[in-house]
Regions:
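Short functional linear segments
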Residues: 1-50, 57, 63-68, 75, ...
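Acidic, Mg2+-coordinating active-site environments of NTP-dependent enzymes
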Residues: 3, 134-139, 155-248, 261
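A generic structural signal for residues located within well-ordered alpha-helices
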Residues: 24, 56, 117-120, 181, ...
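ATP-dependent carboxylate-amine ligase catalytic core
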Residues: 26, 30-34, 38-41, 67-153, ...
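Conserved G/P- and acidic residue-centered "switch" motifs that form tight phosphate/ATP-binding loops
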Residues: 51, 55, 161, 262
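Aromatic/hydrophobic pocket-lining residues that form π-stacking "cages" and hydrophobic walls in ligand
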Residues: 61, 124, 205
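Short glycine/threonine-rich catalytic loop with a Thr-x-Gly-x-Asp
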Residues: 72, 252-263
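A short glycine/serine-rich beta->alpha loop
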Residues: 109-113, 249-255
C-alpha cells in the first residue's frame, strides 16, 4: 500500500480547519502577513471583488497579462477538484512540493488561529513572491471590507464586478449594503474599475471612491455593444477612453461575459 505523503497530510489538515475563526478575516490576515514578513508588499496586486463574474473577470485579467508576457499569479476560490487550483502562475497550479513549502512557511510564522482561507491567502502571497511574479490577480473570498484579502494594503488597482443580493445574513439585505461591503476594498488614492450595470450599487461605489480620492472607471451597458452572437462565440465592441469601437471576440455565448471582459 502506498504511503501517504506530506502533501496529502497537509491537505487533510487544511480540510479539518474551520472556514471561520475568531476575529475578522482582515485582522487575522494582517497579523499573519506581518509575521511572515509581508510578502505581499513586493507584489503588484489587482484586487477583485463583486457578487457575479469575479471569477471570470479574474481569469480574463490574468490571461490578458500573461498574453502580454507578464508572469502572472492568480489566486481564486473555491476550487473544483484540486485545492491547488486556487494558486496558479501562468495557468499552472502550484506544485505539491511548493504547496508543502508554502504551508510550512505559514505554519512556522503564525502566532494565532487561522481559518482555511487565511492559510490559502498567505501561502499564495509567499509562493508568488518566491516565484517573482510580475502581477497577482486576487479574488476576494466573501464580501470585501472584512475579507482576509483586504489585508492587502497596496494593490495597484481595485476591481468590483456586478453586485446583487448574496449572503444577506453576513453582508447586508440590500444591494446598497452589499455594495458598501465590496467597496471596502477601495484604498486611498488607488484607482478602481467597477460595474455600473446595477445603478444603486454603482452609486455607492463611486461615492466611496470619491471619499478615498480614487479615480473610478465605471463599465456600464453603454461601454459594450453586441455585434453578433454566433455558434460558439460573441463579437462585441468596447467604447471608452481607451477603445473606440474596437471589436473583441469571446469563445462563449453567455452575453454577461461582455461586461466581465470589458471590466
Amino acid at each position: 500500500r502506498k504511503r501517504r505523503g506530506m502533501y496529502d497530510e497537509i491537505v487533510d489538515r487544511l480540510n479539518r480547519i474551520s472556514q471561520f475563526a475568531p476575529s475578522t478575516g482582515v485582522e487575522r490576515g494582517r497579523r499573519v502577513l506581518r509575521n511572515c514578513g509581508n510578502p505581499e508588499k513586493d507584489l503588484k496586486i489587482i484586487h477583485v471583488a463583486g457578487t457575479n463574474g469575479k471569477g471570470s473577470t479574474c481569469a480574463y485579467i490574468a490571461q490578458i497579462l500573461q498574453s502580454n508576457g507578464y508572469k502572472t499569479g492568480l489566486f481564486t476560490s473555491p476550487h473544483l477538484v484540486d485545492i491547488r487550483e486556487r494558486i496558479k502562475i501562468n495557468g499552472q497550479m502550484i506544485s505539491k512540493s511548493d504547496f508543502e513549502e508554502a504551508y510550512n512557511a505559514v505554519e512556522n510564522c503564525r502566532t494565532h488561529e487561522l481559518a482555511y482561507f487565511d492559510y490559502m491567502l498567505v501561502m499564495a502571497m509567499y509562493y508568488f513572491k518566491k516565484q517573482n511574479v510580475d502581477y497577482v490577480v486576487m479574488e476576494t473570498g466573501l464580501g470585501g471590507r472584512l475579507d482576509a484579502t483586504n489585508a492587502i494594503e497596496n494593490p495597484v488597482i481595485s476591481v468590483i464586478t456586478t453586485i446583487s443580493l448574496e449572503h444577506a445574513a453576513i453582508l447586508g439585505d440590500t444591494v446598497e449594503k452589499i455594495a458598501a461591503e465590496k467597496a471596502g476594498i477601495i484604498k486611498l488614492g488607488i484607482p478602481v474599475v467597477c460595474s455600473g450595470v446595477v445603478k444603486e450599487a454603482a452609486r455607492v461605489i463611486k461615492s466611496r471612491a470619491e471619499e478615498m480620492e480614487s479615480d473610478c472607471c465605471v463599465v456600464d451597458e453603454n461601454t459594450f455593444e453586441l455585434v453578433q452572437n454566433t455558434y460558439g462565440y460573441i463579437d462585441f465592441l468596447i467604447h471608452n477612453e481607451y477603445y473606440k469601437n474596437d471589436c473583441f471576440r469571446l469563445a462563449t455565448n453567455a452575453l454577461y461575459q461582455m461586461e466581465n471582459a470589458s471590466i
